Design a protein with these regions (language model features):
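Midchain, well-structured core segments that form catalytic/ion-binding scaffolds
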Residues: 1-80, 84-86, 99-108
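Surface-exposed helix-capping loop/turn segments at secondary-structure junctions
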Residues: 1-3, 56-61, 92-94, 157-165
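Zn-dependent metallopeptidase/amidohydrolase metal-coordination segment
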Residues: 95-159, 164-167
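Short alpha-helical functional segments enriched in proximate histidine and acidic residues
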Residues: 53, 89, 152, 156
């Protein structure tokens, strides 16, 4: 599970009758992973499996690989600046540096170009992207979290942006 590989398919068109191999099927999917090497390796394996499935039923398989989100690579130095400010505001017991998770975001793409940090803030409950996902702490969401970000910006820009230049 170190590579956090996830494969998300959806069949857009898959025939008209039960128990009949359709003459035409379209499927869209994407593969996510914690690093680019794993992403490429597992995508190759998935493509091989899709072709094998088509071969098994005498079908053809046309694949078109398109780029998706790159894995998120947060900058440790920038993360530490933000973490120190979060600890100052929320207290050590309320701040944790999480491990990689299986989510994906365009911030992953940005993280391959410049140093980034992607903080998660505990101000909501429910399943992320789910119908039951709701904000349950407005103070943290609208006041404290922006304050942590502002403090981080100040730290980065202080002393002619010395810290930002280091990062």
């Amino acid at each position: 599970e170190d590579d956090f590989v996830r494969f998300h398919p959806i069949i857009n068109s898959g025939g008209d009758l039960v128990n009949v191999i359709p003459d035409y099927v379209t499927m869209e999917s994407y593969t996510r992973a914690a690093n680019v090497d794993a992403l490429l390796r597992y995508n190759t394996d998935i493509n091989r499996a899709l072709r094998a499935g088509a071969d098994a039923v005498g079908a053809t398989c046309e694949l078109q690989d398109l780029p998706g989100y790159l894995p998120l690579r947060p900058d440790e130095n920038l993360r530490n600046v933000l973490r120190d400010n979060a600890v100052a505001l929320f207290g050590e017991e309320h701040v944790a540096v999480g491990a990689h998770n299986a989510g994906s975001t365009e911030m992953g793409d940005v993280s391959h170009l410049i140093p980034v940090v992607h903080p998660w803030v505990g101000c909501a409950k429910g399943v992320l992207h789910g119908a039951n996902f709701v904000l349950d702490n407005e103070e943290v969401a609208y006041e404290k979290s922006p304050e942590v970000l502002a403090m981080t910006i100040i730290d980065l820009l202080y002393d002619d942006a010395k810290k930002a230049e280091e990062i």
